[in-house]
């Protein structure tokens, strides 16, 4: 390039007068549609099949349930891959439990009863442990005197302190 063309291009980029900062190039942001297209092409390569007529999907994680209502579900049994697409809602297990009970079979009901018993044992165990911990913390502040009172202990220390002075 010759010098004249270069100067002409530089002048078009400059926003102010001579000596001002040139404008910065605006970054082009990557959209989510490209990621979605890449994901769909990968899923197609795996060979997932769409599973129709699924009204709800619940994913249990710790004490939280991630719930999808009317999701798009795809699966590839050979690749051990399940894809759940849709808008998720995060709910607590206690909130969603009444809705789920009607969908459980007899085997799952037994498991649910066992879980409920474990939760009750943990809750009662935590209550007892908390009260015992509070009593132990209170005991740390107060010295234990066995067979004597505070007055007699103070009288015994006073003559010993006077004798050593």
From Swiss-Prot:
Keywords: Transcription, Transcription regulation. InterPro entries: BTF3, NAC_A/B_dom_sf, Nas_poly-pep-assoc_cplx_dom. It comes from the Eukaryota. Residues 33-97 form the NAC-A/B domain. Residues 120-134 have a biased composition (Polar residues). GO terms for molecular function: mRNA binding. Coiled coil: none annotated. Pfam families: NAC (PF01849). GO terms for cellular component: nucleus. Residues 120-144 are annotated as: Disordered. Part of the nascent polypeptide-associated complex (NAC). Interacts with EIF(ISO)4E. Belongs to the NAC-beta family. This is Basic transcription factor 3. The lineage of its organism: Eukaryota, Viridiplantae, Streptophyta, Embryophyta, Tracheophyta. The gene is BTF3.
């Amino acid at each position: 390039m010759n010098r004249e063309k270069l100067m002409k291009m530089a002048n078009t980029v400059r926003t102010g007068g001579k000596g001002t900062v040139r404008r910065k190039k605006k970054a082009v942001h990557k959209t989510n549609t490209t990621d979605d297209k890449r994901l769909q092409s990968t899923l197609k390569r795996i060979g997932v099949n769409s599973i129709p007529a699924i009204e709800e999907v619940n994913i249990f994680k710790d004490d939280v349930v991630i719930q999808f209502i009317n999701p798009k579900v795809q699966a590839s049994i050979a690749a051990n891959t399940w894809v759940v697409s849709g808008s998720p809602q995060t709910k607590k297990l206690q909130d969603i439990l009444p809705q789920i009970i009607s969908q459980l079979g007899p085997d799952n009901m037994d498991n649910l009863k066992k879980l409920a018993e474990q939760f009750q044992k943990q809750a009662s165990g935590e209550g007892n442990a908390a009260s015992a911990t509070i009593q132990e913390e209170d005991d740390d502040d107060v010295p234990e005197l066995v067979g004597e009172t505070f007055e007699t202990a103070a009288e015994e220390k006073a003559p010993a302190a006077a004798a050593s002075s």
